[in-house]
Regions:
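Hydrophobic alpha-helical segments and helix pairs
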Residues: 1-21
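ATP-binding/phosphotransfer module of carbohydrate and carboxylate kinases, centering on a glycine-rich
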Residues: 15-171
């Protein structure tokens, strides 16, 4: 139960940095402005909206970190660096249990779909970057549950089944 490196954790770190910038407990950061814009409220009035939004909502603030980092914000850059390092640590831990090299790791989630984040994770792997092949799934994670249910119902799983899912599934 570790969310280090996740969109939620990066979004939560963005909000923490924004509030620390806002109230003077931390360095000034572009995240203060970007998070306030995303909230559509002044930071001083936004706490209820953040808590009501839950984890998925908080994860949407991860994209403010990318924008701030592109603008040269050191705080945002640090958040992204920490996230990439955390994900690389997860992958290193997994490599201990897999003998194949390169091991294949399927990565998914809103944040890791960004090519820049994926490249940061590869870089954070350092000398072990050739020990793991990072791939993105071509179907949503829920596809696995659908396959299980279809098999239980005696429905054959064919390439047409998969292509129909890819064509029709919308979150």
């Amino acid at each position: 139960v570790d969310d280090a490196g996740s969109g939620f954790r990066v979004g939560a770190d963005a909000l923490k940095a924004a509030y620390r910038s806002y109230d003077g407990r931390g360095e000034k950061t572009k995240l203060e402005e970007l998070c306030a814009r995303r909230l559509e409220l002044p930071l001083g009035e936004a706490i209820p909206r953040i808590y009501e939004g839950g984890k998925r909502y908080i994860a949407t603030f991860s994209f403010a970190v990318l924008e701030a980092a592109h603008a040269g914000d050191a705080i945002a850059e640090g958040i992204l660096s920490d996230a990439a390092s955390a994900l690389a640590d997860h992958l290193r831990a997994c490599l201990r249990f897999v003998s194949a090299r390169p091991a294949v790791a399927v990565v998914s989630g809103g944040l890791i779909e960004n090519d820049e984040i994926l490249e940061r994770v590869r870089a954070a792997l350092g000398a072990q970057k050739n020990d793991v092949q990072l791939v993105r799934p071509d179907v949503a994670p829920v596809y696995g549950a659908l396959v299980k249910a279809a098999r239980n119902a005696g429905v054959p799983i064919t390439e047409t089944f998969r292509e129909n899912f890819k064509r029709d599934y919308r979150l």
